[in-house]
Amino acid sequence: MSYSLYLAFLCLSLLTQRTCIQGNQVNVEVSRSDKLSLPGFENLTAGYNKFLRPNFGGDPVRIALTLDIASISSISESNMDYTATIYLRQRWTDPRLVFEGNKSFTLDARLVEFLWVPDTYIVESKKSFLHEVTVGNRLIRLFSNGTVLYALRITTTVTCNMDLSKYPMDTQTCKLQLESWGYDGNDVEFSWLRGNDSVRGLENLRLAQYTIQQYFTLVTVSQQETGNYTRLVLQFELRRNVLYFILETYVPSTFLVVLSWVSFWISLDSVPARTCIGVTTVLSMTTLMIGSRTSLPNTNCFIKAIDVYLGICFSFVFGALLEYAVAHYSSLQQMAVKDRGPAKDSEEVNITNIINSSISSFKRKISFASIEISGDNVNYSDLTMKASDKFKFVFREKISRIIDYFTIQNPSNVDRYSKLLFPLIFMLANVFYWAYYMYF
């Protein structure tokens, strides 16, 4: 019995020892595998100089970029800029960071301070910042072949030169340009990783006043005094949504013009009604013109398309008020002429009778006795008209004929013609306006 227990205890001891040995061998193999694929950062960067670029003194570092446009929060016409939040990803190969295996590992963002990274900056940026909540929004990832992926989340405000001459039917072209600050083309070469496909997110953006029509990427060279620098350009076109402005400005201004035409159907004798309509429409049009410029600075020197249309509408509204002034004045003149008519006729008859009755005696009274004769000199000044008086008489006669030619004989015709001409000319002005600004 005791012999059997001894044999069982011996077998159990041998089995336990063998299992421990096999377990230690497995742990050693796993640790060795991890050490080969995921080396310690200190061992990997031993002798690493972050102040020297990869291939220092040799071929330039080729950096491939991709962009994700998270949002375009604002587009300011007054400041000529736009604000966007982007995810910038850069890839390059650093032979000093090669390790065995086919795996990759992500480092803590704070370790980027110990590695060389490109000095990429955004050209024409007014202000930019890196997001820091809850930690710095940066990512650094190492691959076994030495490839480094460096990603950043940035919000930037970039200049965008705008041509507002066709506002609000304009299309603006904005750019986002990336370039190395200190390394020229002999040290760093930038490129888009997948061409136009390197940029994502623009097609999904929904902007308040704009629609993104198209975008494309370019690679150019920036020539500066310090050298030639590779520049990556993202160019995109923004077309303004005109429907908002049609409802806010164009429709109200058109209604005011039509409202001013109501006075053509009101009698000329209704002075308060027609004057009230004319003055009210003029003041309303002025208020609308001032309100349309509140979104743009007063120093803006552009004559915009919306200003042209509001100017046209204001001209028609003010013209309707002047039309009533002309018609009313002509009506008063006609009434005055009618009142003076009988008296003037009797006056002309009396004068004619006096002249006819006195002309014979007038002829008899003219004698050569009134002519002063002194030797051979004869003074005819009392019998002839001076040249200056004759010129004045002819000039007054011409002016009188011109005034009579332009005098409105029937003031009611002014309203009758205005009912046709004002709408016709306004429609023609709209046809030319929309055709020019929409298609030219």
Curated annotation (Swiss-Prot):
Gene name per UniProt: Gabrp
Range of residues in the leader sequence: 1-23
Transmembrane segments: 242-262, 271-290, 302-322, 420-440
Organism name: Mus musculus (Mouse)
NCBIfam families, A to Z: LIC (TIGR00860)
Membrane topology, as annotated: Multi-pass membrane protein
Residue ranges annotated as Extracellular topological domain: 24-241, 291-301
Subunit structure: Heteropentamer, formed by a combination of alpha (GABRA1-6), beta (GABRB1-3), gamma (GABRG1-3), delta (GABRD), epsilon (GABRE), rho (GABRR1-3), pi (GABRP) and theta (GABRQ) chains, each subunit exhibiting distinct physiological and pharmacological properties.
Residue pairs linked by disulfide bridges in the UniProt entry: C160-C174
Major subcellular site: membrane
Keywords carried by this UniProt record: Cell membrane, Chloride, Chloride channel, Disulfide bond, Glycoprotein, Ion channel, Ion transport, Membrane, Signal, Transmembrane, Transmembrane helix, Transport
Known function: Pi subunit of the heteropentameric ligand-gated chloride channel gated by gamma-aminobutyric acid (GABA). GABA-gated chloride channels, also named GABA(A) receptors (GABAAR), consist of five subunits arranged around a central pore and contain GABA active binding site(s) located at the alpha and beta subunit interfaces. When activated by GABA, GABAARs selectively allow the flow of chloride anions across the cell membrane down their electrochemical gradient. Pi-containing GABAARs are mostly located in peripheral tissues.
UniProt subcellular location: Cell membrane; Apical cell membrane
Protein name: Gamma-aminobutyric acid receptor subunit pi
Sugar attachment sites: N43, N102, N145, N196, N228
Domains (record comment): GABAARs subunits share a common topological structure: a peptide sequence made up of a long extracellular N-terminal, four transmembrane domains, intracellular or cytoplasmic domain located between the third and the fourth transmembrane domains.
Topology feature Cytoplasmic, residues: 263-270, 323-419
Gene3D superfamilies: Neurotransmitter-gated ion-channel ligand-binding domain, Neurotransmitter-gated ion-channel transmembrane domain
